[in-house]
Design a protein with these regions (language model features):
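Polyanion-binding surface elements
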Residues: 1-24
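Intrinsically disordered, low-complexity regions enriched in Ser/Pro/Gly/Gln/His and often acidic
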Residues: 16-18, 65, 124-125
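A short, Lys/Arg-enriched interface patch at domain edges and termini
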Residues: 42-83
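Low-complexity intrinsically disordered segments
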Residues: 70-158
Length: 158
């Protein structure tokens, strides 16, 4: 489900994702965002902002130490990125993030079946990836165009 074909700046990705630029810079520093940026980076950044903050029950993580992405976090970000261009992605598509796995489900019936079959009291995060993909064209269109500042050029002596 390709939304646009244009490249986006790091700032535009953050704005379209509804996040501060600091999230985009953190994501860039951890290798989540690499240039050039396209529409899939917007959804990937949103997912990164969620999963980078999760600490599963029973897991200890010092707040002051630099936190590199764990495998499940990277997998969640990449699954979200792939959902943007997946022709099976619908507004009902959801990304389930569990401590040991990531699952994309497309329909409400699949969500119910997944809940019954796989969750059974487990902690999970459900992200509305399909809705975010559906909102991408408007989110990107609403990003204000920034004009480059004019540089002060030396005026010729008169």
């Amino acid at each position: 489900m390709s939304v646009t074909s244009g490249q986006l700046s790091t700032s535009a990705v953050a704005t379209a994702a509804g996040l501060s630029e600091s999230w985009a810079w953190k994501a860039r520093d951890q290798g989540v965002l690499t240039e050039p940026h396209f529409e899939d980076a917007v959804v990937a950044l949103r997912v990164y902002a969620f999963v980078s903050q999760i600490v599963w029950p029973g897991t200890r993580r010092p707040r002051s130490a630099r936190q590199d992405l764990e495998l499940w976090q990277s997998t969640a970000v990449e699954a979200a990125r792939q959902a943007v261009t997946d022709p099976h992605t619908t507004p009902d598509t959801a990304l389930y993030v569990l401590e040991d796995s990531v699952h994309l489900v497309t329909t409400p019936a699949e969500r119910a079946a997944f809940d019954l079959k796989c969750l059974g009291g487990r902690v999970a995060l459900r992200l509305p990836i399909g809705l975010w993909v559906t909102e991408l064209p408007d989110a990107i269109a609403d990003v204000p165009n920034r004009r480059r500042r004019k540089t002060n050029q030396s005026k010729p002596a008169a």
